[in-house]
Amino acid sequence: MCKDSQKPSVPSHGPKTPSCKGVKAPHSSRPRAWKQDLEQSLAAAYVPVVVDSKGQNPDKLRFNFYTSQYSNSLNPFYTLQKPTCGYLYRRDTDHTRKRFDVPPANLVLWRS
């Protein structure tokens, strides 16, 4: 039995659909398309600009950009894809953990 049939009829401005039958909205892929458009627009927004080439040929410069594959939510641009092994590994790269916390308080000074 349909419970909507007991309500008084009120004129509505939208399209009329049967209230007792389950009507499913057609599945659309809009969120996926919106996500792709957003990623493309963000990628297009970051255009590399060489401020000081330091005597190097600007055509030979290589630009690294942040990708979501290597995420770091605390400081996303600090650890820019530092490989820990493989062909791109370099010994002079600092791979140690960084402390981004608030420094601890000196409790002896606060007790007085």
UniProtKB/Swiss-Prot annotation:
InterPro entries xrefs: CIMIP3-like
Keywords per UniProt: Cell projection, Cilium, Cytoplasm, Cytoskeleton, Flagellum
Cellular compartment(s): Cytoplasm, Cytoskeleton, Flagellum axoneme
Lipid metabolism found in the keyword field: no
Highest taxon of the lineage: Eukaryota
Region (Disordered): 1-34
Annotated PANTHER family: RIKEN CDNA 1700001C19 GENE
Family: Belongs to the CIMIP3-like family.
Name of the protein in question: Ciliary microtubule inner protein 3
Annotated source species: Homo sapiens
